[in-house]
């Protein structure tokens, strides 16, 4: 298992859980599959997987709450699985700290592609609790925007001299904005550059992550340009 990417898959439907586990294992992943949120949390704490796939509707501890508990302890990437793309549960999952979501029923190849895309963003095919990413800002050094400091070498952020804890996805998003302060970046462009989507994606993923980033670096630091996208105030 040490040489494989370890996936924690939490799904209460026996058929989906077993079929998906087999499909992922055929693609070379090591999979721990659990049937409910509480056992999923125990497995996460014991095994420290490289990525977690969480169904939204879970018995005992629902997927959104499980995501929140995981995010309190780790920056490991999380993908939520939802039966409805328009469900408020998708937004709640993203707000709880999920990095992406996949709508059920899903094609196995699509799920594998999404997992690999998330892992590429995190800069590893394995490994757990670190905050890192292949940055959009190629130049090293510290970028300063008012009381906000972005260290593109150390992948660290400070606000008014105090460390700001960001997930790898939030860090990549901030690096993208920092590489072009004052430039409007469309949601589609951010999906392409930050989420590594080679196809159309749900722009709500961008919106929720921008809001999460704002709560950490300042609500007025990232400006919404209606009809176009977002920009970092220079």
UniProtKB/Swiss-Prot annotation:
Organism: Streptomyces coelicolor (strain ATCC BAA-471 / A3(2) / M145)
PTM comment, free text: Phosphorylated by CseC.
Protein's UniProt name: Transcriptional regulatory protein CseB
SUPFAM superfamilies per the UniProt record, alphabetical: C-terminal effector domain of the bipartite response regulators, CheY-like
Function description: Member of the two-component regulatory system CseB/CseC involved in the stability of the cell envelope. CseB activates transcription of RNA polymerase sigma-E factor, in response to changes in the cell envelope.
Encoding gene per record: cseB
4-aspartylphosphate found at: 55
Taxonomy of the source species: Bacteria, Bacillati, Actinomycetota, Actinomycetes, Kitasatosporales
Family annotation (SMART domains): REC, Trans_reg_C
Domain Response regulatory: 6-119
Keyword Metal-binding: no
